[in-house]
Amino acid sequence: MVAERRLRVVVIGEEAAGVQVLRGLMALPTPPEIVAVLTRSPAEGGARPVVYESAQKLGLDIWPSSSVRSPDLAMRLRNAEVDLLMNVHSLFLIHPSVLAAPAIGSFNLHPGPLPEYAGLNVPSWAIYEGARSHGVTLHWLDDGIDTGPIVWQERFDVDSTDTGLALSGKCVRLGVPLVFRLATVAATDARLIPREQQDLSRRRYFSAGPPAEGRLDWAQPADAILRFVRAADYAPFDSPWGHPRAQLGGVKAGVAKAAATGVAATQPAGTIVELDDSGAVVATADELIVVQRLWLDGRYLKPKELLAD
């Protein structure tokens, strides 16, 4: 790399993490040159394209995010003399020739500890499984999915009240600074970027969809049910899992929020023991829980609104 010129990077990004990376890179003491941002455009629909809007405000060039699947992008990156390709919360599979195009390498910010939590929606899976700790990993990109060598990893506790959104937020808060650290080290001496091979014998891969096809079973212990509900809770945003569905008083609805009571259940699992303005008290395999909010036909409801005679 020519010492006189700044580090040249391309960012593939979505969501709040992508916005924070763009702003933070430009605020570094020696900011890299952001050659382009690849992100979803408003024309593609879906959630608000916050990275697209941020890139526009910052005056950055925007390229279609879908182009990462084409080898044509590799030539474009080489012609632009790109040093780093940074993937932040974009789910497109990147063509191998694109990964190999940057002079230094391509990197991914993954919201989970590797190799134990590879795949999609892993903050939710961690809560569902009852993990006591979680992590965020910055790693080199290779031809596999979340298999590349680790650059840095931050681990942290999972609180008993963490929702899917809360745990994802922790990943962003601790993970985004790793991207800034990478840019700083790469600009100084790229040979100092760590490259720790993963122990793939410990690898577990998680799919995007929810466990049990999104069905909640009242015959499970209360703790397992509450973890499922919290894992799917991304309010006020849409949940990638939806809300776990259950039969309650003859109605099938998503359980959006629930809480423990610590009271032993003596009734059959699924029995509504009490129904008032605070929610529906429901029996599980071992304890009573309070179902506080349901989801049906695109809106949230109090159980009393749906279940009262």
Regions found by a protein language model. Name each.
Residues 245, 252-253, 273, 301:
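Polar low-complexity intrinsically disordered regions enriched in Ser/Thr and small residues
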Residues 217, 247-263, 288-297:
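A short acidic-to-branched-hydrophobic micro-motif
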Residues 259-279:
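A conserved acidic, glycine/proline-rich C-terminal tail/linker
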Residues 1-240, 274-278, 284-309:
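One-carbon transfer enzymes
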Residues 245-247, 279-281:
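Residue-level detector of beta-strand face positions
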